[in-house]
C-alpha cells in the first residue's frame, strides 16, 4: 500500500496545440483511400452530445436512469483548406478553377495531432493522434471584409456531425485517440506510415479494426 502523492515531478501534464491535419474523403465503399495535408488548420473543437439520463420511477422511488446515445460533432477552423475539401463543403468543379455550390456533400474523415507536455520535457513529452470518422460538414458562413490598416486573414469555420463506424467487440465510434507516450514507438511509426503515407504508399485513414491490428501486431 502507498499513500497518494499529487503533482510529482514529471507527472504535471498538459495538452496543447493542433497540427498536422489530414483530410480523407470517403469513397463509395466506406473507406478513406487518399489523404490530403490540411495546411492552415487552426482549431478543431470536438463537441460530444447526448449521453443524457432519462430517469424512470417505480414503487415511489427512482428506479433507474436510461442513457441516450452519445454523438460526436464539432467545429473545424482554418485559414485555408485542401482542394479535396470542396466536395465535402458542397462544391463541384464544372471546369478547371470553376466551382458551383449547393451540391451533395461528401462524408470525410480526418486526423490531427495535439501536443502533450509535462513539467520536465515541456512540449517534447509526447503527442496524441486524433482520428475522426464518418464526418459531414454543414453549410457555413463566409464573411469577406475590406483590407484596412489592421489586416486580418479570413478564418473559415465549419460545423460537422458524425456517423459512427463499427469496432469489433465495442459499440460503434466516430473517433479514436492514440497516446504516443503509451504506444510502442515501432507500432506508432507503422500507423503513421499509413496515415501520412510514405515513398511507396498513399496516405489513407484505416478503419478502427485495422488501427487495432496495427497497434496490436
Please provide the spans of the model-predicted regions.
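Polar/acidic, low-complexity leader/linker segments enriched in S/T/G and N/D
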Residues: 1-46
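Structured catalytic/translocation cores of nucleotide/phosphate-coupled proteins
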Residues: 1-5, 65, 217
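Short, charge-rich amphipathic segments
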Residues: 2-9, 23-29, 78, 88-94, ...
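Short amphipathic beta-strand and strand-loop transition segments with alternating hydrophobic
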Residues: 42-46, 62-63, 138-145
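Membrane-targeting and insertion segments and their boundary/processing signals
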Residues: 43-50, 132
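Oligomerization/assembly interface segments of phage tail-like spikes and tubes
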Residues: 46-48, 56-85, 150-165
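Structured, beta-strand-rich domain cores
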Residues: 62-138
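Mixed-charge, glycine-accented linear interaction segment located at domain edges/termini
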Residues: 139-142, 146-217
Amino acid at each position: 500500500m502507498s499513500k497518494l502523492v499529487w503533482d510529482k515531478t514529471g507527472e504535471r501534464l498538459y495538452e496543447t496545440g493542433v497540427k498536422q491535419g489530414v483530410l480523407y474523403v470517403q469513397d463509395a465503399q466506406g473507406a478513406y483511400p487518399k489523404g490530403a495535408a490540411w495546411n492552415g488548420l487552426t482549431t478543431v473543437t470536438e463537441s460530444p452530445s447526448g449521453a443524457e439520463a432519462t430517469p424512470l420511477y417505480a414503487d415511489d422511488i427512482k428506479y433507474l436512469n436510461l442513457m441516450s446515445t452519445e454523438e460526436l460533432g464539432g467545429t473545424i477552423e482554418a485559414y485555408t483548406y485542401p482542394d479535396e475539401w470542396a466536395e465535402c463543403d458542397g462544391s463541384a468543379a464544372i471546369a478547371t478553377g470553376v466551382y458551383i455550390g449547393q451540391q451533395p456533400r461528401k462524408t470525410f474523415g480526418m486526423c490531427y495531432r495535439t501536443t502533450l507536455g509535462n513539467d520536465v520535457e515541456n512540449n517534447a513529452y509526447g503527442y496524441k493522434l486524433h482520428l475522426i470518422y464518418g464526418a459531414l460538414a454543414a453549410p457555413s458562413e463566409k464573411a469577406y471584409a475590406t483590407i484596412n490598416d489592421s489586416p486580418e486573414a479570413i478564418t473559415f469555420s465549419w460545423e460537422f456531425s458524425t456517423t459512427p463506424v463499427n469496432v469489433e467487440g465495442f459499440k460503434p465510434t466516430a473517433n479514436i485517440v492514440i497516446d504516443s507516450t503509451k504506444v510502442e514507438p515501432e507500432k506508432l511509426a507503422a500507423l503513421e506510415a499509413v496515415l501520412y503515407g510514405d515513398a511507396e504508399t498513399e496516405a489513407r485513414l484505416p478503419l478502427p479494426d485495422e488501427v487495432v491490428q496495427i497497434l496490436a501486431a
